[in-house]
Amino acid sequence: MKILVASRNPKKLAELSRVLESSGVSGVELVSLTDVPEYEEVPETGASFEDNALIKAREGVKHTGLACVADDSGLAVDALNWMPGVLSARWSGRHGDDAANTALLLAQLSDIPDERRGAAFVSACALVTPEGEEVVVEGRWKGSIARIPAGQNGFGYDPIFVPRGGLRTAAELTPEEKDAVSHRGRALAALLPMLRNLVNLGRTAP
């Protein structure tokens, strides 16, 4: 069966694909927003990651008739009162400019001592079906903000996020290492029972 992943980011699609494969869930064809007829995406106006994930998943079902998985995630920094939060992707003003977002965040934390650079990645994943079923789960990944970027893997703020108890940034981890501990990996793992049930029931889009 086909399941829509409400994203144009191939790394998010690959992440869900790895989680499904490692968990033995088969018979799923994941499609992204680039694989379906284009539709106008609703602005992410929710006050929380959960709100935004549901907004995206509901729109995906509405426009394609496919069961839809959507996530909204971001970085919550202790010293910034848990911002950027839902503004993480456009913290510098332009949506998806990872380099600018990272540079601005590092500048804002330049005078913050190491012991006060705590942060957490947060991911909310929503699954909405054509039958109207909805579920939202959350995953968190605690750590701290490095002073300089390091690593070539991942995306977003990965090069400056050091997981708690680790010495490498998230961008220095292999995809498999990251899947096992990351916020999105944890959220997707929590979503697996619902995805497995959906596949077993063999629900198909109109």
From Swiss-Prot:
GO terms for cellular component: cytosol. Binds 1 Mg(2+) ion per subunit. Pfam families: Ham1p_like. Substrate binds at residues 7-12, 73, 155-158, 178, 183-184. CDD domains: HAM1 (cd00515). Keywords: Hydrolase, Magnesium, Metal-binding, Nucleotide metabolism, Nucleotide-binding. Its EC number is 3.6.1.66. Signal peptide: none annotated. Its cofactor is Mg(2+). Transmembrane segments: none annotated. One of its GO terms (molecular function) is ribonucleoside triphosphate phosphatase activity. It comes from the Bacteria. The active site is at 72 (proton acceptor). It catalyses: XTP + H2O = XMP + diphosphate + H(+); dITP + H2O = dIMP + diphosphate + H(+); ITP + H2O = IMP + diphosphate + H(+). Mg(2+) binds at residue 72. GO terms for biological process: nucleotide metabolic process; purine nucleoside triphosphate catabolic process. Homodimer. Belongs to the HAM1 NTPase family. This is dITP/XTP pyrophosphatase. It comes from Mycobacteroides abscessus (strain ATCC 19977 / DSM 44196 / CCUG 20993 / CIP 104536 / JCM 13569 / NCTC 13031 / TMC 1543 / L948).
